Amino acid sequence: MSKRIGISGARSPWWWIPTVYFAEGIPYFVVNSISVTMFTKMGVPNGEMALFTSLLYLPWTLKPLWSPLVDIFKSKKWWIVTMQALMTAAFILLVFSIPHPSPEMIASGRTPSGLFTFTLVLFILTAFASATHDIAADGFYMVVLDPGQQSFFVGIRSTFYRLSSIFGQGVLVVIAGLIESHTGNIPLAWTLTMAVTAVIFALITLYDMFLLPRHKADVAVKSSGRSSAGEFARAFVTFFRKPGILAALAFMLMYRLPEALLLKMVNPFLLSSAEQGGLGLSTATVGLVYGTIGVTALTVGGIIGGMAASRWGLKKSLWPMAAFLALPCAAYVYMSMSMTHNILVISILIAIEQFGYGFGFTAYMLYMMYFSEGEYKTSHYAICTAFMALSMMIPGAFAGYLQEMTGYVNFFWIVMVCCIATAGVTCLLKVDPEYGKVVKK
């Protein structure tokens, strides 16, 4: 698999897959996870925080609409490097855009979201660039590598994406927490954390600019606008004419409802004071417990879920995975009622919940692949991922207001009731019993 390294020749994928997929994850987690923690620590009310940060999912929902442009204009390498440069610029501007509300305003929990207007604009810009980078990176992966290399490196790319998750949700949050504990200045902590992010991302961008290989197959696709538009429209029409489309849409939109509500309120719950109904953990502790231990458990759950599905197939795995995804949400009911401050107990409960989520999410991913089978497999899978993003965006947008109206205990009980939706849509599915099983030769 080793190949000669040259300026215009093929390079070993080991030179670029780690950085490209690490860079794919960082902006996603900064936009969708760090933003939640930062706004919470800055005293933005949960309702406004959850609404605005959920809307940041929009580019990942809409990306199938402009994905053909990445094929038609310029090479995939050009798109990857350009989007990385754009995101580097956005991270640098974020360093200077973060407002500095007074400690009294932060403590009140009523910091106006209007203070963060420019910050949100930069997050939106980063989100669109990140979604476009996803399209280009996956396209580059498929164009440059042969099928054997694609199979070999699929685990490598997933590993570095998960490492970026630990870095984004764990390491960066711990850095912010340590700076906060040493200086007592929350805005300064997040400003310096964004500076660290900008420097690291700039280095990755420079590396990929020079080390990402040029490849003869990585060229703009030449096709007439009319034929491209026709194929694009045909892909959408055939998707919505698939047998079982209503059950599939219900599943894609409702299967993750408990997790979609829960996700936006986990960090606020862990960070909020006891008077506000939270556990009052420090920022650094949340970065360690949720961003590192939790993400590791999530990854292990996904790996074991893949092994289980390959042995039993999707049909037999579906109900156990649905149960694993939904029922561990009870961990937050327990924590909110007991108000435990035992870090070991909190870590174990979060690890169980995240393991269940990783295990249960496997069924969701496999079903999207199953439903996408056919002539327009790639386009149909992209549409499925858009519905996946929508399934997280809409419930998340209202989660904060729901929590403010009900309090954390009642909110987590509502999340448990929503597990009925997960079970209900799972009942609707009809799946080939052999799909997902590894064929023994």
Segments the model singles out, each with a brief description of its role:
Residues 3-60, 247-251, 255-275:
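Helix-loop boundary and gating motifs at the non-cytosolic
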Residues 85-112, 323-341:
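C-terminal ends and interior cores of transmembrane alpha-helices
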Residues 132-145, 359-373:
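Intracellular juxtamembrane helix-capping segments at the cytosolic ends
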Residues 315-364:
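C-terminal transmembrane helical hairpin of 12-TM major facilitator-type secondary transporters
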Residues 62-75, 300-319, 403-404:
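Helix-to-loop junctions at the C-terminal end of transmembrane segments
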Residues 1-10, 44, 98, 104-120, ...:
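Intracellular loop-helix junctions on the cytosolic face of multi-pass helical membrane proteins
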Residues 46-47, 147-156, 283-284, 374-384:
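Loop-to-transmembrane helix entry/capping segments in MFS-fold secondary transporters
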Residues 371, 375-403:
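A late C-terminal transmembrane helix in Major Facilitator Superfamily
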